């Protein structure tokens, strides 16, 4: 009897170890593909830590994911590497974003996807509530450095709640939303600084009904949070929150 228990335990340990090795190998494989990106993309890796972030969020091979407010598609390409040829990445941008910076984001996304370069990416130039996707389509989604633009405006709390509810509906039960943003302090003008007042945003996020976890991967205590995020002194090295918002398994 003891031998049977021992063998069963040993077998389970070996299976778990094999699964861990396989998962690590898959992550290492797609992360290696990041070196094929442009030098302009790669230079941001030190501050954004894409492989570590996606690993912590649990995003990997074969998943259907969305890059929310993808802008020029930096994270779109990272996600494309992560999910591989059997996965799908929806690069979503509200059409209004293409009016900014003389159409820079449209040009950048078009160049990134030219000639089917990222074959697993579907471009969605639509507002988030008009994607045409069925509820429960996504395994994961990510919004990087965008949430402050939603909640910093008048009526921002309602807009933020609506955004989170829409994304939650698109996620499968157990699906994950990764939310990354520049940290701002409550006593500062975060609209001008392009930062997120975390103290004000947390109640909005917590009320959305996700299971919430946070990581210090992108925190930077050297950022005093008084400079605008595009200031060369701090650009690319801001103090950032990273939240993992998981839709409950019961779909609630």
Whereabouts are the PLM-identified features?
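A short acidic, Gly/Pro-enriched loop at the edge of an enzyme's catalytic core
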Residues: 131-142
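Class I SAM-dependent methyltransferase Rossmann-like catalytic core
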Residues: 30-54
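Conserved Class I S-adenosyl-L-methionine
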Residues: 113, 190-215
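Conserved beta-strand signature within the Rossmann-like core of class I S-adenosyl-L-methionine
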Residues: 174-182
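Conserved class I S-adenosyl-L-methionine
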Residues: 62-71
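Core SAM-dependent methyltransferase catalytic element
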Residues: 225-252
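A short glycine-rich, Lys/Arg-flanked "PGG" loop and its adjoining helix->strand segment in the class I
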Residues: 80, 158-173
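S-adenosyl-L-methionine
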Residues: 102-131
């Amino acid at each position: 009897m003891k031998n049977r228990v021992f063998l069963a335990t040993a077998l389970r340990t070996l299976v778990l170890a094999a699964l861990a090795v396989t998962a690590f190998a898959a992550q290492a494989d797609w992360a290696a593909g990041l070196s094929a990106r442009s030098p302009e993309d790669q230079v941001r890796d030190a501050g954004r830590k894409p492989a570590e972030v996606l690993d912590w969020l649990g995003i990997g091979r074969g998943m259907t994911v969305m890059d929310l407010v993808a802008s020029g598609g930096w994270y779109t390409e990272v996600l494309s590497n992560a999910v591989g040829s059997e996965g799908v990445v929806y690069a979503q941008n509200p059409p209004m974003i293409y009016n900014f910076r003389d159409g820079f984001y449209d040009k950048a996304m078009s160049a990134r996807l030219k000639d089917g370069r990222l074959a697993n990416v579907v471009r969605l130039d639509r507002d988030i509530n008009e994607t045409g996707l069925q509820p429960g389509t996504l395994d994961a989604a990510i919004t990087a450095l965008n949430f402050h633009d939603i909640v910093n405006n008048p009526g921002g709390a309602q807009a933020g709640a609506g955004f989170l509810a829409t994304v939650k509906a698109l996620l499968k039960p157990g699906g994950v939303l990764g939310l990354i943003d520049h940290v701002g302090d409550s006593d500062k003008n975060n609209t001008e600084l392009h930062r997120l007042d975390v103290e004000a945003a947390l109640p909005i996020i917590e009320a959305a009904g996700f299971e919430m976890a946070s990581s210090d991967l992108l925190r930077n205590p050297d950022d005093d949070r008084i400079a605008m995020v595009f200031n060369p002194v701090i650009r690319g090295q801001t103090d950032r929150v990273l939240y993992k918002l998981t839709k409950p398994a019961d779909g609630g």
